Amino acid sequence: MWVPAVANLLLLSLGLLEAIQAQSHLVTRRDLFSQETPLDMAPASFDDQYVGCAAAMTAALPHLNLTEFQVNKVYADGWALASSQWRERSAWGPEWGLSTTRLPPPPAGFRDEHGVALLAYTANSPLHKEFNAAVRQAGRSRAHYLQHFSFKTLHFLLTEALQLLGRDQRMPRCRQVFRGVHGLRFRPAGPGTTVRLGGFASASLKNVAAQQFGEDTFFGIWTCLGVPIQGYSFFPGEEEVLIPPFETFQVINASRPAQGPARIYLKALGKRSSYNCEYIKEMQCKSRPCHLDNSASAQERLSTAWSLLLLLAFLAVGPFPGSPGLF
């Protein structure tokens, strides 16, 4: 019964691809100097979900954070800027920044340091770029993470913040988002390939806002683990959604013209992590037994029901509706 629907989806995808390829693009500095990189499962990414060790990580944060401040000036400066902004916003009360929307109260367990971490990540500072570059390489080995990754605190706080903010969604709430990337032209894998984004990926509910982040690669994404962080972003007008590095996607369609941006369309599949609670294992589990949940290290896929719902959504509105600013 799904054959006609799948056929329609394929035809629609092919039509979108032909429309994209038919367009001409001017050669710009972006096209000449952007780097190329494959889009794959990002095997070197550090993807810890901290399943079963969140409380232990929280207890370790004061010492760990101080240590990282001493060796990582970019992180220390970014955290100081975000802390100042958090204090100002807290003093303003429920209306933050330029937004006139009254924010809902934060979820249970959400602490000031979660808010500061989100502000630090979204600020217009060198921190975002250096942090994600480090995340993409920190998982090359456990030793590399333990000895050379000086963003352990920020990685944990961002991961836990997204888990807490997404907890009220009950079942995964999937949404269409857009992501523009500057300086990287991804080499898309073929349709049907499973991929990850390799780091914490900022996207927007608005395609025009996403283009401001860059147009070397432009993604259209159906995400089920990405969480809206508008109220906790330095720039709430961007309607930002933050996607964790362990979410997996299926490539639905892709184009990589000789000139102009690569365009890649992804649909959520589930999540996969190679690491879990690595810092706690190193600090606490050598001298005494630790009982940690290792379930996060296995591949988890969306349920069949949610996969079908995603397919229906694609068929209902098209993978990525053509609107001004997208094509």
From Swiss-Prot:
Lipid bilayer topology: Lipid-anchor; GPI-anchor
Subcellular location: Sarcoplasmic reticulum membrane
InterPro entries in the cross-refs: ADP-ribosyltransferase_ARG (IPR050999), ART (IPR000768)
Keyword Cell cycle tagged: no
Reactions that this protein is recorded to catalyse: L-arginyl-[protein] + NAD(+) = N(omega)-(ADP-D-ribosyl)-L-arginyl-[protein] + nicotinamide + H(+)
Family indicated by similarity: Belongs to the Arg-specific ADP-ribosyltransferase family.
Listed name of the protein: GPI-linked NAD(P)(+)--arginine ADP-ribosyltransferase 1
Species for this entry: Oryctolagus cuniculus
